[in-house]
């Protein structure tokens, strides 16, 4: 996960995952995800092994449909952060991710206070689309463990 830099935008200073808009050179949505991962945090895109696609998530403040993917690399990466976009990397343990408890947080979105599902991870509030993606990952992983 990443902490986005502070900037004039709807995702300023929020916890999320690398990502962005599809570009002409991208051959697929997964290729977009790989490119963004390499650009934002320096993980070599050709080293990432795709596990599966998660459910698309609509993000009202930015009016985007996000198409998340789960992938992994088989080594500890040397992160190279894009300082324009990423403030820091947040690396919770796998155990932490699998044992999250959903809480509710009040957040301000476009001058409107909303109650949204969230998690606390390493003293950071993770909410919105990021929380939805993590929750789906947890459900899928626990299903595999119980199969």
Question: Which sequence ranges carry the predicted segments?
Answer:
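Unchanged
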Residues: 7, 22-121, 125-126, 135, ...
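A conserved hydrophobic position in a structured secondary element of the catalytic/binding core
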Residues: 17, 92, 129
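N-terminal strand-loop-strand
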Residues: 1-17
